[in-house]
Amino acid sequence: MTPSTDLNLPLFERAKALIPGGVNSPVRAFRAVGGTPRFVQRAQGAYFWDANGQRFIDYIGSWGPMILGHGHPAVLEAVQKAALDGFSFGAPTEREVELAEEILRHVPSMEMIRLVSSGTEAGMSAIRLARGATGRSRIIKFNGCYHGHADALLVKAGSGLATFGHATSAGVPAEVVQHTLVLEYNDIAQLEEAFALHGSEIAGLMIEPIAGNMNFVRASVPFMRRCRELCTQHGALLVFDEVMTGFRVALGSAQSVYARDIPGFQPDITVLGKVIGGGMPLAAFGGPRAIMEQLAPLGPVYQAGTLSGNPVATACGLATLREIARPGFYEALGERTRALTGGLADAARAEGLPFSADSEGGMFGFFLLPELPRNYPTVMTTDGARFNALFHGLLDRGVYIAPALYEAGFVSSAHSAQDIDETIAAAREVFRLVSAG
């Protein structure tokens, strides 16, 4: 494909004249890897087709929601039926009650839930709720964890534990982030020092249990255990951001994975998104009844939304959750994902390239490093130039991974063994070229 025949390019030029950067979310612009974004025309199963009609094996899946693949028959049927009943009412429906029941059935830490329209909205509301429920202002977050683009959470680390964070975006006043303390992921000593200094002021600790915006970095079990202990000890709320991991890594979400090693483990507030909407704009946050009843109209913490509980989105999410709750679903999904990461690792190492990978359920990540990183500074040591070469080599061969070094990948139940084999074969060719170059 040459620039003169690539139909994605004129679409991108048209978009750039109308939309900042030509995209409606920055990572889609290919700024990190260079080149022209692929404009999707349609998708089905494990594939999408771009403006040129080229088919790609899709390992993004709308950044996680498409756990069943694109166009699953049961989901399509549910959405079509709901659309015939009406797009939006601004009033309660039975379907949103059914979706709430389905979510709570699988996530026992949540006794009540509030539906919203995006992960950012859910995260922002969870922080407001934590502050309202505790009467405190300080929030802990971790370097490299992304919780949406709410002002108070667009923060990078300060110069030390005695100082609070600095905004990572223009337009965010310093006074908005002065109550946000940023720590290094998986650093128990730093965590303990933060609570020793500020414990009585901390409303909540917000964490991605698997940091999907550092590609794929797990919170260690000892670190997570200490997060829970310190929050309990100091009266702070543990807020689990499972927008990405919720129903993606296990039916009980990532918190159920940690509960295997930490008896009785539960967060205080859980933030969900992506999979629970099945690809439509839907997210949620929830927790124990005593905390959730602090929300309006019952309590003093205000939260509202015109499209919250949208009837078409809830139909999509409900159909998705009912499909993934079938026996054996996650076992098969995890096996397929491990086949992918294992095959990629073998192919890279055969060419003498450093490579490490990890996965849980249908979520995975890999690094061009000999060992898995444990926090943002170690993630940053990976070879960006080699990753970009790998990305474009796979893209040329019809395999679509995230166009950024620091984003997780996703396998769906629609990915076949043949898709995995085709991907590994393509990667083997690219690793050979990268190693030689």
Curated annotation (Swiss-Prot):
<dbReference type="GO" id="GO:0005737">
    <property type="term" value="C:cytoplasm"/>
</dbReference>
<keyword id="KW-0627">Porphyrin biosynthesis</keyword>
<dbReference type="InterPro" id="IPR015424">
    <property type="entry name" value="PyrdxlP-dep_Trfase"/>
</dbReference>
<comment type="pathway">
    <text>Porphyrin-containing compound metabolism; protoporphyrin-IX biosynthesis; 5-aminolevulinate from L-glutamyl-tRNA(Glu): step 2/2.</text>
</comment>
<dbReference type="GO" id="GO:0008483">
    <property type="term" value="F:transaminase activity"/>
</dbReference>
<keyword id="KW-0413">Isomerase</keyword>
<keyword id="KW-0663">Pyridoxal phosphate</keyword>
<dbReference type="GO" id="GO:0030170">
    <property type="term" value="F:pyridoxal phosphate binding"/>
</dbReference>
<dbReference type="InterPro" id="IPR005814">
    <property type="entry name" value="Aminotrans_3"/>
</dbReference>
<comment type="similarity">
    <text>Belongs to the class-III pyridoxal-phosphate-dependent aminotransferase family. HemL subfamily.</text>
</comment>
<keyword id="KW-0963">Cytoplasm</keyword>
<feature type="modified residue" description="N6-(pyridoxal phosphate)lysine">
    <location>
        <position position="274"/>
    </location>
</feature>
<dbReference type="InterPro" id="IPR015421">
    <property type="entry name" value="PyrdxlP-dep_Trfase_major"/>
</dbReference>
<protein>
    <recommendedName>
        <fullName>Glutamate-1-semialdehyde 2,1-aminomutase</fullName>
        <ecNumber>5.4.3.8</ecNumber>
    </recommendedName>
</protein>
<dbReference type="GO" id="GO:0042286">
    <property type="term" value="F:glutamate-1-semialdehyde 2,1-aminomutase activity"/>
</dbReference>
<dbReference type="GO" id="GO:0006782">
    <property type="term" value="P:protoporphyrinogen IX biosynthetic process"/>
</dbReference>
<dbReference type="InterPro" id="IPR015422">
    <property type="entry name" value="PyrdxlP-dep_Trfase_small"/>
</dbReference>
<dbReference type="InterPro" id="IPR004639">
    <property type="entry name" value="4pyrrol_synth_GluAld_NH2Trfase"/>
</dbReference>
<dbReference type="Pfam" id="PF00202">
    <property type="entry name" value="Aminotran_3"/>
</dbReference>
<comment type="subunit">
    <text>Homodimer.</text>
</comment>
